[in-house]
Curated annotation (Swiss-Prot):
It comes from the Eukaryota. Residues 1-34 are annotated as: Disordered. Residues 1-17 have a biased composition (Basic and acidic residues). The lineage of its organism: Eukaryota, Metazoa, Chordata, Craniata, Vertebrata. The gene is Kcnip2. It comes from Rattus norvegicus (Rat). This is A-type potassium channel modulatory protein KCNIP2.
Length: 270
């Protein structure tokens, strides 16, 4: 059951590779190894020393690895006190195990990393923007971070809790292809009315190009975002009614090999 004040998750550096260009407009990006390293920087607690399941060959550089965190034990006096000091107390591990596709051990490690970044137990939009901007210092990621935050904050209360974080992370990392595509659709559906308009997609495209900064400018022509939106709709809007529904979105993505390949980038990150 969802606890009071609960929303839906933080996380995912949407820095996919060039094969995802058909869907997001990203210019050619890092390899899966580089993506994984960036993801591990977002959550230092997910380094190989914390999660034994992480492949050593894809681990973050040693300089990025913090000390190995002590597992969270909800039955210990110390951790009980630690949990009592945060503004938002997370649901029990057993309940989160049932709601996500993470093991108890993974949830323990994720909680410690989340609390290190967000001692109060929740993160608001401004803090989220600050965290996200670290990964795109060459550009302006604020608009894209807002869209991403709203996708995680599904109850629209202006904050993301640990439960939200792991719920979204579970979809991104462990969800089925349909689950991931549905999550992506929700990200692009800015007003959450069940369809994507050209105006919404243009806002997304502009925010992506702004975020990538010097990796797209000055080579990027001013009209490039709008041209990409037209290409997107020509591909996705099957019945030509001017909007893209979730059914059209998922069907079109599933028929695109490049998009399907890019959806595998987060497999086995942790």
């Amino acid at each position: 059951m969802r606890g009071q004040g609960r929303k839906e998750s933080l996380s995912e550096s949407r820095d996919l590779d060039g094969s995802y260009d058909q869907l997001t407009g990203h210019p050619p990006g890092p390899s899966k190894k580089a993506l994984k390293q960036r993801f591990l920087k977002l959550l230092p607690c997910c380094g190989p020393q914390a999660l034994p399941s992480v492949s050593e060959t894809l681990a973050a550089p040693a300089s990025l690895r913090p000390h190995r965190p002590r597992p969270l034990d909800p039955d210990s006096v110390e951790d009980e006190f630690e949990l009592s000091t945060v503004c938002h107390r997370p649901e029990g591990l057993e309940q989160l195990q049932e709601q996500t596709k993470f093991t108890r051990r993974e949830l323990q490690v994720l909680y410690r990393g989340f609390k290190n970044e967000c001692p109060s137990g929740i993160v608001n939009e401004e803090n989220f923007k600050q965290i996200y901007s670290q990964f795109f210092p060459q550009g302006d990621s604020s608009n894209y971070a807002t869209f991403l935050f709203n996708a995680f904050d599904t109850n629209h209360d202006g904050s993301v809790s640990f439960e939200d974080f792991v719920a979204g992370l579970s979809v991104i990392l462990r969800g089925t292809i349909d689950d991931r595509l549905s999550w992506a659709f929700n990200l692009y559906d800015l007003n959450k009315d069940g369809c994507i308009t050209k105006e919404e997609m243009l806002d997304i495209m502009k925010s992506i190009y702004d975020m990538m900064g010097k990796y797209t400018y000055p080579a990027l022509r001013e009209e490039a975002p709008r041209e990409h939106v037209e290409s997107f709709f020509q591909k996705m809007d099957r019945n030509k009614d001017g909007v893209v529904t979730i059914e059209e979105f998922i069907e079109s993505c599933q028929q695109d090999e490049n998009i399907m390949r890019s959806m595998q980038l987060f497999d086995n990150v942790i």
